[in-house]
């Protein structure tokens, strides 16, 4: 089976590509830049191309192939500074990909959305796929709009689409200074002897899911998900910023480091709590996350200590 992974050299995409290769698929990764050191050695084809270039997408897609779309040009925090850019940098290319997928006749297109932003403030926890969607960030609004376009193409043009909505992914390859990823940023602050900044009394509550579990969930949805369906990928367990810091305290103490916290006023654009219910995918195929937050956080800490610079 030929599988094309757009955005497959990134933080999540590189793990997805490895899962696909292990499943016996022939994988082609599409990225805007040459592959990094952690992906260059993997046995797959690589194409430098831009999602926004429809001619390039038309050339890369093949009849009967699978497509996984992980490409996105912005992050939630920076989307507030230029909402128009967030929209224009992401929506046209995503819609163009859907059109090209219909034209070429792909076997299935899996869209990676955002479980952490599209639902907005929670009515109940954990959040199921049927929860109302009311995003309060430009990033979440654009992500949800792309979801709607994908489902519209399924209903009106028979495009076989599956949408997955991961919670907050983390892992050792996550960069700490991109404006996305509290765990990596907190570890970086400790190792750099800087204050960890949290907004509000305890910070936000998030469902942290290890990137390897996101990758296995994407593969499970690709293989067992229903066309036109949406699946959350999460642990169902929430942790506040202070909970995370409490887990980091013994790790820091073991190396003689101290943790300093700076409390800042709450921000209006932060969703207070986001915890996902992934029972739908579990019922479909038995998928469940494997890595606990404590285990994953320790893995990140140990990796940060053994690298030449902070994460």
Describe each PLM feature range:
Residues 42-53:
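Rossmann-fold cofactor-recognition segment
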Residues 190-311:
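C-terminal substrate-binding subdomain of Rossmann-fold SDR/epimerase-dehydratase oxidoreductases
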Residues 51-89:
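NAD(P)H-binding glycine-rich loop region in Rossmannoid oxidoreductase-like domains
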Residues 81-96, 108, 117, 121-163, ...:
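Catalytic helix-loop patch of NAD(P)-dependent Rossmann-fold dehydrogenases
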Residues 30-34, 51:
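N-terminal Rossmann-fold cofactor-binding loop
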Residues 3-22:
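N-terminal Rossmann NAD(P)H-binding glycine-rich loop of SDR-like oxidoreductase domains
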Residues 6, 30, 67-73, 109-115, ...:
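SDR active-site strand-loop-helix element
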Residues 46, 86-87, 101:
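A hydrophobic alpha-helix adjacent to the NAD(P)-binding/active-site core of NAD(P)-dependent oxidoreductases
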């Amino acid at each position: 089976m030929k599988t094309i992974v757009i955005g497959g050299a990134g933080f999540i995409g590189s793990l997805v590509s490895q899962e696909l290769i292990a499943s016996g698929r022939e994988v082609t990764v599409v990225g805007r830049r040459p592959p990094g050191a952690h992906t260059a050695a993997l046995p797959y084809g690589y194409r430098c191309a831009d999602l926004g270039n429809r001619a390039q997408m038309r050339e890369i897609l093949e009849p009967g192939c699978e497509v996984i779309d992980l490409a996105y040009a912005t992050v939630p925090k920076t989307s507030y500074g230029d909402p128009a850019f967030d929209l224009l940098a992401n929506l046209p290319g995503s819609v163009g990909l859907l059109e090209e997928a219909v034209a070429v006749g792909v076997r299935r297109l899996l869209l990676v959305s955002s479980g952490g932003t599209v639902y907005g403030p929670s009515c109940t926890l954990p959040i199921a796929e049927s929860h109302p969607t009311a995003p309060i960030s430009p990033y979440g609004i654009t992500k949800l709009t792309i979801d709607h376009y994908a489902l519209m193409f399924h209903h009106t043009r028979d495009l076989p689409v599956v949408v997955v909505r991961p919670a907050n992914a983390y892992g050792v390859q996550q960069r700490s200074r991109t404006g996305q990823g509290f765990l990596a940023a907190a570890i970086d602050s400790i190792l750099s002897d800087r204050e960890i900044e949290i907004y509000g009394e305890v910070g936000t509550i998030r469902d942290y899911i290890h990137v390897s579990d996101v990758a296995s969930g994407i593969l499970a949805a690709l293989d067992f998900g229903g066309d036109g369906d949406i699946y959350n990928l999460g642990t169902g367990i929430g942790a506040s910023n202070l909970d995370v810091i409490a887990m980091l305290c013994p790790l820091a103490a073991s190396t003689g480091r101290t943790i300093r916290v700076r409390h800042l006023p709450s921000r209006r654009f932060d969703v207070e709590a986001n915890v996902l219910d992934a029972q739908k995918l579990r019922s479909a195929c038995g998928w469940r996350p494997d890595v606990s937050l404590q285990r994953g956080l320790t893995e990140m800490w140990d990796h940060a200590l053994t690298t030449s610079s902070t994460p």
